[in-house]
Regions:
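Active-site loop-to-helix "anion-binding N-cap" substructures in soluble metabolic enzymes
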Residues: 1-258
Length: 258
């Protein structure tokens, strides 16, 4: 089965709505100038909540083929939840994807596996594809706890009956540190995630689920990861704020001669 590669940019808490407009325009124009094949590779951006409406309006008005994702959502659909954002609202903004369980949410906001699971269900209710982020800390890595990202995936999707899913393996020790897992290390973990998903959840879901690598990804190292058979794309952090750099990452096939 051929899985369409997915290149996603997580802007985190960067760029206001005016900066977002300029960044989206430059990214789209750069890719269009290079005759980018959007049918063969999905390009997804995850701006801050305050940027989503501006980005959506621009994408729709200009016919850009970029896809919107949100950086998080509430496990609740509506009500007295000050500061939370419902999946219903995101769906109305044509967010096709949503990041769930990013390591910064797990660490800074103490999000548990149980809350991540509830958010996956919320995304499913509103027809948004969850990008479930998993990964081990430096302490867990040093302790040989290689099962951590696998267990996080299984806890996120158990009993959900979900039919479409993206997983982003981001070793916490490689996020924003400049330290990068080797392509072989990433492939080994991602293969283990896929095998466990097949064995314990659903073989068909495991086969079609795209699993991304994230952690200090740049244009000069993306090719090594995407040559691997089980790595279906990347989740990019800081480098996605630079339109030209992110466009070069999205054009990874030029780097690997495909």
């Amino acid at each position: 089965m051929t899985r369409t590669p997915l290149i996603a940019g997580n802007w985190k808490m960067n760029l206001d709505h005016q900066q977002a407009i300029a960044t989206v325009q430059k990214l789209a124009w750069t890719l269009d100038d290079a005759d980018f094949d959007y049918e063969g590779v999905e390009v997804v951006i995850a701006p801050p909540f305050t940027d989503l409406r501006s980005a959506q309006t621009l994408i729709d008005a200009e016919g850009f083929k970029l896809i919107l994702a949100a950086q998080d959502l509430s496990d609740q659909d509506h009500g007295a939840y000050t500061g939370d954002i419902s999946g219903e609202f995101l769906a109305k903004l044509n967010c096709q994807y949503v990041l769930i369980g990013h390591s910064e949410r797990r660490m800074i906001h103490n999000e548990s596996d149980q809350l991540v699971h509830a958010k996956v269900l919320a995304a499913k209710r509103h027809g948004i594809v969850p990008i479930v982020c998993v990964g081990e800390s430096l302490e867990q890595k040093n302790a040989g706890q290689t099962e951590v990202p696998i267990n996080q995936v299984l806890e996120a999707v158990k009993d959900t009956g979900i039919s479409e899913l993206v997983i982003a393996y981001e070793p916490v020790w490689a996020i924003g540190t400049g330290e990068v897992a080797t392509a072989e290390q990433a492939e080994e973990t991602i293969r283990g995630i896929r095998e466990s998903l097949a064995e314990q959840v659903d073989e068909g879901l495991a086969e079609k689920t795209r699993i991304l690598y994230g952690g200090s990804v740049k244009a000069n190292n993306v090719a090594g990861f995407l040559k691997m058979p089980n790595i279906d794309g990347v989740l990019v952090g800081g480098a996605s704020l630079d339109s030209e750099e992110f466009a070069n990452i999205a054009r990874f096939r030029e780097h690997i001669g495909v």
